[in-house]
Design a protein with these regions (language model features):
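Acidic, metal-coordinating catalytic segment for phosphate/diphosphate chemistry
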Residues: 1-18, 88
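Short, well-ordered beta-strand micro-motif
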Residues: 21, 97-101, 117-120
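A cytosolic small-molecule/anion-sensing beta-strand core signal
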Residues: 23, 31
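Nudix hydrolase/Nudix homology domain
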Residues: 106-158
């Protein structure tokens, strides 16, 4: 029996994963091609599949959305994303965001991402044309700080 997950107005929270990928002083972002957040820039990530580990799930989502192969380094943050509509919960995700390093692949938008790009810190940390959700900025900043604290070799940075 196949069970379809109801993403809109779910009965229970859904579990997702996200990736903060820092390379050469930039962070990788995707523009969402589907709801929620359609048309908005965010971190690569998505829904965890049944039976899948968190680490495998984040690597799979990054590969599906960006074409890149990554290795998760460590958990950055575990958070709730709740979108309400008319006094109801339209979306509720619990998301585990990981600091990841690129280990292969070729960058290209795929799956539910309609664009991908490397973004300089000044772009995501300011009021530029790139509008990011405050929670996303907080997660990126946490990942950026952790990446800076690690040896650059550990993240594959040049």
């Amino acid at each position: 029996m196949t069970h379809t997950v109801q993403r809109e107005f779910p009965e229970t929270p859904l579990f997702g994963v996200g990736a903060v990928i820092v390379e050469s002083g930039r962070v990788l972002l995707v523009r969402r091609g589907q709801q929620p957040l359609k048309g908005k820039w965010s971190l690569p990530g998505g829904m965890l599949e049944l039976g899948e580990s968190l680490l495998f799930g984040v690597a799979r989502e990054v590969r599906e959305e960006t074409g890149l192969e990554v290795e998760p380094i460590e958990l950055i943050e575990l958070l709730d994303r709740v979108h309400r509509e008319d006094n109801r919960v339209r979306y509720h995700y619990v998301i585990a965001d990981y600091l990841c390093r690129v280990v292969g692949g070729s960058l290209q938008a795929a799956s539910d991402a309609d664009a991908v790009r490397w973004v300089e810190r000044a772009e995501w940390n300011s009021h530029s044309a790139l509008i990011l959700d405050p929670i996303t900025v907080r997660v990126i900043e946490s990942g950026w700080q952790r990446a800076s604290a690690l040896n650059s070799k550990d993240l594959g940075n040049k």
